[in-house]
Amino acid sequence: MNDIRRTILWVIFGFSMVLLWDQWQVHNGNKATFFPTPAQQAKLATDAASAVPQPVGVPAAVVPSNPATVPVVEARSANKEWVEVETDVLKLSFDTEGGTLSRVEFLNHVDEHKPGSNVVLLDDSKDRIYTAQTGLISSVPGVLLPTHKTAMAVRPGVRKLKEGANELSITFESATQNGVKLVKTYTVKRGAYDMAVKHDIVNTSTQDITPQLYFQLVRDGNKLAGESSFYSTFTGPAVYTDAKKYQKVEFADIKKKKFDIEKQSSTGYIAMVQHYFASAWILPDGMNRNISMDAVDIGSNMADCCYRATLIAPLET
């Protein structure tokens, strides 16, 4: 019988509001409110996932300068299953394909351009593509591991935060692929706009494996409908590192490959900014990661689709 080995990694996926205020605070020499410095990030991760075990088996090795290619994003098929989770402030929709977070609705924030409707940030529809994806990359050429395109089973559980409860979780589990199974668990707390995301990589083979875990934010390059013609807020990816601090990148510059970001770091985050809101993947402080941004063709009929910001981190199990 094979010895089953596991690597468990917790990360934070969060949303922020009033991004312009945040940037104004930094510009004036104050601490960022929504996009903290690395020291603040560590506290955010601790607060959002209190009593959560620290990452296990994550090596200190430098991320390869030429990491394996992240699987290409593809348009969502019509036969995918949606799973909804609701807290007091968020309505979340997940796709069983990859356990992807595909829609986020803010229940306490009305959309100024759509009276009677709430703000929707992440979305996977005919009008918008904006999703948060994760998956594994094998270190062995030609060997496929579970990715954001892998069908996953959702475990039974509570789907709406109950009165008196402080948190709820939803778990997606892939089938074993080349001796490796990926189990994702999203945990969100009452009143919170961030969540702890646990990646449990189960190695059932007799071989040691050194996969890479990728985190990406994918969005089309279109502005929000109804945005004022007199002013325009930034929409696009952003990155924070110690070396180059906060950098935002225009979609047009990504398409032209005319941008300069820090490509390797042991701190920081990637984000996708949309109007006054943003989402971000925040990895544990001190964990090496490779950072990239690119334009990808997902086979969608939508104009200017799509772009992705990606973090890739090494693992060992």
Which stretches of residues belong to each language-model region?
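Membrane interfacial helix-start segments of signal peptides and signal-anchor transmembrane helices
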Residues: 1-11
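Residue-level micro-sites within transmembrane alpha helices that shape
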Residues: 5, 21-22
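Hydrophobic membrane-insertion alpha-helices, especially the h-region
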Residues: 9-20
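Juxtamembrane extramembrane loops of integral membrane proteins
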Residues: 10, 23-121, 172
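Soluble non-transmembrane domains of integral membrane proteins
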Residues: 77, 82-317
